[in-house]
């Protein structure tokens, strides 16, 4: 019988696809401009690449282990990206225009909000969004 994954585990697989996809985009011709910026906005370095690869790999591991491990992944991811947004935003407050600062941070803002929302609401035992019991 095939293994059944809870909704939060499926979300973790989705985040794995997102992060591993961003990692792989670095190696697609035409995505990076002459200044090394992805889509002309996002500076991608080896450290950033490793961060995306690590976040995607940890998402797969959390999803495969259990719903509880996937939930821990989302809490840690939310905290990590919240710290990232605050430090980047504050560090670049007087270096780049406010609008560009917000736009550059928008993917990470959406990720930490989604991660906290998933960790706090998806697949909780006894909730309406729970499709399987948490392991």
Question: Language-model features: where?
Answer:
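Membrane-interface extramembranous regions
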Residues: 1-135
């Amino acid at each position: 019988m095939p293994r059944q994954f809870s909704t939060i585990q499926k979300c973790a697989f989705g985040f794995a696809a997102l992060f591993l996809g961003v990692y792989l985009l670095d190696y697609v011709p035409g995505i990076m401009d002459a200044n090394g910026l992805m889509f002309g906005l996002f500076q991608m370095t080896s450290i950033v690449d490793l961060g995306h690869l690590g976040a995607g790999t940890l998402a797969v591991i959390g999803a495969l282990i259990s719903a509880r491990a996937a939930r821990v992944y989302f809490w840690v991811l939310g905290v990590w990206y919240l710290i990232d947004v605050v430090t980047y935003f504050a560090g670049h407050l007087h270096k780049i225009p406010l609008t560009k600062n917000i736009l550059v941070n928008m993917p990470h803002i959406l990720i930490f909000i989604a991660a906290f929302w998933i960790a706090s609401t998806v697949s909780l035992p006894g909730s309406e969004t729970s499709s399987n019991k948490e392991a």
